[in-house]
Amino acid sequence: MSTISVRNVTKKYGAVTAIPDLSLEVTKGEFIVLVGPSGCGKSTLLRMLAGLESITEGEVAIDGEVVNNMMPRQRNIAMVFQSYALYPHMTVAGNMGFSLKLDGADKAEVAERVNEVAKILALDSLLDRKPAQLSGGQRQRVAMGRSIVRDPSVFLFDEPLSNLDAKLRVQMRAEIKSLHNRLGTTIVYVTHDQIEAMTMADRIVVMNAGTIEQVGAPLDLYDQPANLFVAEFLGSPSMNLIDGTISDSGTVVLGSGLELSLGASLRAGAEVTLGIRPEYISLSDTGGMKARCMVTVIEPTGPATILVVEMGDEKVTIEVTGRVAHKVGDFIDIWMAKEHCHLFDTSSGIRLDQ
């Protein structure tokens, strides 16, 4: 396992700056997940760590050694792609042991290492099969096994589960996390799927437009988002964001006319955005701000029900456990838990209740 230091790294493609002055520290054995929308720079950053992309400015260090000018193979890093990139004419054993052969290992050493890793990944009964004879999940495990046999100091995963169906994604999430717990190798994992990020990471790095918006433990980011982007990006359904202004008495007045005191000390007339997650809005009197709303959408998911209601001109999403008797068009009362409300500066996006 290794430490990774990204220091003031910039990546430019001609006149276009994809990543401007980014810094990040990854500790030994940490499972870091880079998450963000498509085009935010997360895969570019991963490829710079691997040596597959040049660094325009700044430096990347592994265990304190700057690797900017090192070839990918010299960095002792293994990368797993979403495409698997398996050789179709080789068996599972052949694919897994190929890099060891390139390194000059003898047949006995290759076979021993391949068999050892195959047992860890439950591939020992599939070693004689070709990739075409495997399921998507099995092919992904072979791709992981091919990396593990090299005993790298860092694993890089670039959206490895994107091509799998929903059931396999859940299974592979658990397998990758279990593998990390067993091996203890430093992992940097890229995904656009926030569920993967929340369930797998020791720390999440939320990226947007080539910059880091926030870094922290999954639940810390979920409960205490630094800004509007993180608040809206993490969570499914996403956080409700409701426009408002600060009154002369310091309360938050929402567009619907509702008024809420959050104890914020802001100038009168300031434009703010109130944020509250769907699960913190109740259909029964639990205290907090009460509002009369009309139901516009009901989505039963089995264990929970998602409702979308109109509160004045705003649409608000609510998530409740179990099922509801309400119908579309019904008028209902809702209660927003004051202790779970966040206040953001509408212009800058920065959270104010920190």
Residue ranges of model-derived segments:
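Conserved ABC transporter NBD signature motif
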Residues: G58-V66
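Non-catalytic connector elements of ABC transporters
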Residues: P237-N240, S249-Q354
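Helix-to-loop junction immediately C-terminal to a conserved catalytic motif
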Residues: A50
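The feature captures the beta-strand-to-loop junction immediately N-terminal to the Walker
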Residues: V35-P37
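Conserved coupling/switch loops of ABC nucleotide-binding domains, chiefly the family-specific signature
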Residues: T56-E59, E109, A209, C341
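ABC ATPase nucleotide-binding domains
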Residues: F31, P72-F229
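ABC ATPase nucleotide-binding domain
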Residues: S5, E25, A61, T245, ...
